[in-house]
Amino acid sequence: IVMAGLGFILLTVAIYGAYQLKKDSADGRILVWKVAARAVCENPWTGYGWDYVAGAYGDAQETYFAEGDYTETEERVAGSPEYVFNEYLQVALAWGVPVLLLALLMVGGSWCVGHRNGCYGLCGALLSFGVFAFSSYPLQFPLFWLSLIMAVAGCAFSVLPSQIGGWKIFAVFVLLAVMVA
């Protein structure tokens, strides 16, 4: 319990220090997340479409500031971002909460299968992607899509018997790569 408490204190200090290091950037992201979450609440089932995320965000931000319940800091850091800086919110905004939950279930399920079968490298890749996606926008780049699909597929295929040749699994990866590209 002492180690857990010490770890929590160190983590809290580290997060606070990182926040102070780039305060305006952090405040801007918090505003973006706040406004994006409000936009998701307006259309949670189907989202607004991938191409209209920036427009939906702009409309939600306009409504937020029109209500007048904002701080001076929020007014100072407001802008017109192309991305929400949080892929979970971005996916929910684009395609709705059900698609987000389905994607999380698929990635989480493949992580569990991979972990159970000793695919720790792939599980680490999925975990790092998940952490990175919390404060950035990796799904905007095809290389990250491909990496995510390959890690999910690698974990999922870890349950296949070893009698299936490696070339067949490689062929599936190549097909997935072609579909993404």
Where do the PLM segments sit?
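Membrane-interface helix-loop junctions at the exits of transmembrane helices
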Residues: 46, 55-68, 131-142
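Transmembrane alpha-helices of multi-pass inner-membrane enzymes
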Residues: 1, 7, 118-172
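Transmembrane helix irregularities
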Residues: 92-96, 134-135
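A membrane-periplasm/extracellular boundary helix in multi-pass inner-membrane enzymes
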Residues: 1-42, 50, 59, 166-181
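Structural signature of transmembrane alpha-helix termini at the membrane-water interface
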Residues: 15-19, 105-115, 131-138, 154
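Alpha-helical membrane-protein architecture signal
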Residues: 33, 46, 81-88, 127
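Interfacial juxtamembrane loops and adjacent helix segments
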Residues: 50-93
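Hydrophobic transmembrane alpha-helices and their immediate junctions
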Residues: 95-121
